[in-house]
């Protein structure tokens, strides 16, 4: 191992040239898996790298759970986010399905299912608007103004499962045109004040969503699942369906949307997970 480390640290790094035609054949998933996988592999075996390499990065190796591994895993998450964002296109559509292909969709609240008592008095609060107003809308007003659009798409969970479901609702794009955000807004901060933790205590959930993704033609603010109004288990009366993102971005029981110029906080990003979560 000592000889290998010495050879590795002393050997000059030569540039690798890749033909542009080869890069063009790579899919986004190829790039993500290659980059994130390389960094994750380095994190797992990082303790075997020469100490001077860690020192050049301002780190001090301390074993498989040391700071260098956390640093590398964070870099892998950042690469995932950055590549996903860079390759995003509104022209990239996820596959759609027929009603015969619909599969069961489980209740996947991270904590306890909220008490349905919130539904009768539910309103959606809109903030960060160009008008300077803070607007409160009930579900009937939203349905009447924006009409109904249907999408049968796959919901993909970061835990490894997926389900095909028929969602109905109005496009996020329509909401943005009806209630324009403040000038130079780039983000939407979506909140659910009714979310609970595993013990049934209040645990507000919130996600950050870039407005380019909000404008994607398949992004819905859904009110129905498989032809019926949303139940509490699936985010009644209004939830986000954004099939180009992982399930954790598809926030249930939305109570507030705020448009911002700067990237807002995100529940899982604050807990060490990625923030973009593109598919």
What role is predicted for each listed range?
Residues 1-26:
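N-terminal secretory signal peptides
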Residues 7-8, 43-44, 109, 198, ...:
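Intrinsically disordered, low-complexity segments enriched in small/polar residues
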Residues 8-12, 146-147, 180, 225:
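Generic secondary-structure transition motif, activating predominantly at the C-termini of alpha-helices
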Residues 8-11, 46, 91, 239:
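Generic N-terminal simple sequence motifs
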Residues 11-12, 18, 110-113, 129, ...:
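Intrinsically disordered, low-complexity segments enriched in polar/charged residues with Gly/Pro
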Residues 19-27, 32-35, 40-178, 252-265, ...:
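Near-N-terminal "mature-domain entry" segment
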Residues 150-152, 170-279:
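Mature-region segments of soluble proteins
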């Amino acid at each position: 191992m000592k000889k290998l480390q010495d050879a590795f640290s002393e050997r000059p790094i030569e540039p690798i040239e890749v033909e542009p035609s080869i890069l063009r054949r790579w899919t986004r998933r190829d790039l993500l898996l290659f980059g994130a996988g390389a960094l994750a592999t380095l994190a797992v075996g990082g303790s075997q790298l020469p100490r001077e390499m860690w020192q050049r990065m301002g780190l001090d190796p301390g074993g498989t759970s040391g700071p260098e591994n956390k640093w590398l895993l964070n870099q892998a998450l950042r690469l995932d986010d950055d590549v996903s964002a860079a390759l995003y296109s509104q022209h990239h559509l996820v596959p759609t399905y027929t009603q015969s292909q619909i599969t069961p969709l489980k209740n996947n609240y991270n904590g306890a299912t909220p008490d349905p008592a919130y539904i009768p008095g539910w309103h959606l609060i809109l903030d960060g608007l160009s008008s300077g107003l803070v607007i409160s809308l009930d579900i009937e007003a939203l349905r009447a103004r924006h009409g109904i659009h249907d999408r049968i798409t796959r919901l993909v969970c970061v835990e490894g499962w997926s389900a095909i479901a028929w969602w109905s609702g109005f496009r996020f794009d329509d909401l943005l045109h009806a209630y324009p955000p403040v000038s130079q807004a780039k983000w939407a901060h979506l909140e659910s004040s009714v979310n609970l933790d595993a013990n049934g205590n209040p645990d507000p959930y919130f996600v950050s969503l870039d407005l380019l993704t909000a404008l994607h033609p398949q992004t819905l603010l859904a009110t129905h699942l498989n032809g019926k109004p949303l139940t509490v288990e699936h985010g009644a009366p209004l939830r986000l369906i954004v099939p180009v993102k992982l399930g954790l971005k598809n926030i249930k029981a939305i109570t507030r949307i705020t448009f911002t110029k700067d990237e807002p906080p995100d529940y899982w990003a604050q807990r060490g997970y990625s923030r973009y979560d593109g598919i």
